[in-house]
């Protein structure tokens, strides 16, 4: 969300916001909210080629249908195993549901925060790692396991510490819309 970043722009700087649950069912409900985000981008000459949402909206998407009764989020599993990220489609575009995208709701008049996802032109975002992944292996350290100090050597254990530094650069924050749910807890 732009905290502790060396970059001048981050995704939360977008001025385009749509609150999920504000479009009445007769006008499309959550489907209408998703399309409202598309409209904000198109009116600004931007495109929408994908979505990223937090798992807190999964029940909302799975229970939402358009005016013809078709499901809003169509899951497109790529394999038979459970994935960390759930791939799917929203209004004909790639969508991913995962963990770690939400921000807390800040009570007030009106409430703020409550970001649950983003839609936009993901070619305007790049990510990478600095220096790859570094790791250390130890059989002699003492670590805390379930609140107790445990000797790796005495218990025939191995500890592996892996570290990586990742970065996300947003080229054009106007190419994104954030979706919020100010009622989320």
Question: What are these regions, as identified by a protein language model?
Answer:
Residues 60-63, 126-127, 169-171:
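Short helix/loop capping segments that flank catalytic or ligand/cofactor-binding pockets
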Residues 1-43, 67-68, 83-85, 90-91, ...:
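Alpha-helical scaffold segments that mediate packing/assembly in large oligomeric complexes
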Residues 15, 52-57, 61, 76, ...:
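Active-site proximal loops enriched in glycine and acidic residues that flank catalytic Cys/His/Asp
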Residues 43-45, 108-110, 126, 151-155, ...:
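A structural signal for short secondary-structure junctions
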Residues 150-185:
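Protruding loop/beta-arch "assembly-hinge" segments enriched in small, turn-prone residues
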């Amino acid at each position: 969300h732009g905290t502790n970043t060396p970059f001048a722009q981050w995704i939360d700087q977008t001025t385009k916001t749509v609150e999920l649950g504000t479009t009445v069912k007769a006008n499309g409900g959550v489907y209408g909210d998703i399309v409202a985000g598309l409209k904000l981008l198109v009116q600004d000459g931007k495109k929408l080629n994908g979505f990223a949402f937090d798992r807190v909206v999964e029940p909302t998407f799975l229970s939402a249908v358009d005016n013809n009764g078709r499901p809003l989020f169509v899951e497109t599993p790529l394999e038979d195993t459970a994935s960390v990220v759930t791939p799917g489609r929203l209004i004909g575009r790639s969508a991913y549901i995962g963990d770690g995208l939400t921000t807390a709701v800040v009570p007030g008049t009106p409430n703020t925060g409550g970001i649950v996802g983003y839609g936009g032109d993901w070619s305007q975002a790049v990510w990478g790692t600095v220096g790859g992944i570094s790791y250390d292996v130890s059989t002699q350290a003492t670590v805390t396991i379930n609140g107790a100090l445990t000797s790796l050597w005495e218990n025939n254990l191995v500890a592996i510490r892996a570290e990586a530094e990742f970065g996300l650069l947003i080229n054009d924050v106007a190419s994104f819309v954030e979706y919020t749910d100010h009622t989320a807890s």
